[in-house]
Every structure is written in C-alpha cells, then in structure tokens.
C-alpha cells in the first residue's frame, strides 16, 4: 500500500476510482479476508492525506449518471473488473458478460477493466467500453499469446431527457513502448 500511495500520480482536481478484482489483489481477499480496495483508500487517506483515491468496491460498481437538466432522470454506468482470461476475439468476453446480466440490471454503459483491451462495442443496447491498460506486455502475456492495449480513452456521453445514452464519443490514446523487450533479461529489442 505504501509503495502505491507514494508513487501513484496525483493531479489537482482528478480523482481515481478503484475497483478491486477477483484475481491478483482479490486473492488476498479470498485467502486472508483483506479488502484491498478499502485498505488502499484508507492508507491513502490516513497516512498520506490523499483524498484522490476512492474505492468503489469489489469487482463491480453501479454509478448513477444524473441528468444535468432533469434532477429526477438518471441511468447507470457499471464499472467492472470481471476476471477471466482474454478470449479469441475482443468482443467475446464482453458479449458473454452482458448476456449473463439478469433482467432489469442492464446499465446503459459498462466500463471494463481486467482484460488489458481497448474497445467500444454495443451489445444488447449496452455501450461496452474497454479502457485499455497501463501494463506493457510481459513474459506471461507473450507466453499465453495475449495482446495488451496500452493506453486509455476519454469518453463523452450524451444523456437524453429520459436518461438514455443515445450518443457517445470516445477518443482513444494508444502507446507503443518497448517494455517487453527492454525490461527483460534478454535485450533483443
């Protein structure tokens, strides 16, 4: 926690919302009963006086999107760190995820983490966004023939008078670095 809180960038006016997953940090929760997201936020607040790191919860968080002009009108964005491996096609895992949602719980938008993919798709009238990642390809990814999409996305959503999101725009920023080659023991790059 200390390493993260000391090194994670802090920018005036920006807040990072955290979803902890069912893998990596989630293993601590399963074995030791530690809620890593909560612990990270508390360490940031108590020890480092940081209020820019906010824990949304474990694996999923429904975020209410309020209409600016109609206070009683809203819809939901689901921030999800779903787990599971990358599929043969980028669209497959989000498709199966949306198909598994029960009636009445489909959000307007799902922002997916975990798969290290950047995408925008519409599946069953749900806008599905893969936010990319900040981790360059490593030996695990190369060995398993995975593709990591290093980068991120700025998304604008337009909400109509009944709360639906009929229009959106995503600006993707992709980075190409040589970390796989340069951060390994074999300097072939």
PLM regions: where:
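General small-molecule cofactor/ligand-binding pocket signal
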Residues: 54-57, 64, 78-80, 129
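Conserved beta-sheet core of the metallophosphoesterase superfamily
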Residues: 74-78, 83-170
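Alpha-helix termini
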Residues: 45-50, 67-71, 98-102
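A short C-terminal boundary segment appended to hydrolase-like catalytic domains
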Residues: 159-189
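Core catalytic region of metal-dependent phosphoesterases/phosphodiesterases
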Residues: 1-55
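Short, structured patches in soluble enzyme cores that scaffold and shape functional sites
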Residues: 20, 67, 79-83
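Short acidic-hydrophobic surface loop/beta-edge motif
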Residues: 59-71, 121-123
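Residues that act as N-cap/strand-start positions at coil-to-secondary-structure junctions
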Residues: 57-59, 149
């Amino acid at each position: 926690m200390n390493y993260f809180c000391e090194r994670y960038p802090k920018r005036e006016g920006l807040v990072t919302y955290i979803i902890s997953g069912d893998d990596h940090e989630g293993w601590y929760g399963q074995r030791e009963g530690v809620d890593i997201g909560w612990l990270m936020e508390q360490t940031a607040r108590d020890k480092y006086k940081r209020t820019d790191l906010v824990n949304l919860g474990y694996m999923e968080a429904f975020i209410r999107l309020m209409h600016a002009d109609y206070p009683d009108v809203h819809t939901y964005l689901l921030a999800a760190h779903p787990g599971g491996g990358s599929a043969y096609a980028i669209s497959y895992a989000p498709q199966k995820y949306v198909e598994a949602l029960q009636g009445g719980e489909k959000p307007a938008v799902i922002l997916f983490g975990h798969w290290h993919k950047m995408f925008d798709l519409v599946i069953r009238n749900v806008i599905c966004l893969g936010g990319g990642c900040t981790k360059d390809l490593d030996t695990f990814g190369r060995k398993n023939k995975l593709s990591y999409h290093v980068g991120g996305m700025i998304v604008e959503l337009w909400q109509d008078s009944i709360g639906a999101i009929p229009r959106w725009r995503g600006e993707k920023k992709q980075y190409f670095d040589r970390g796989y080659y340069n951060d390994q023991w074999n300097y072939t790059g």
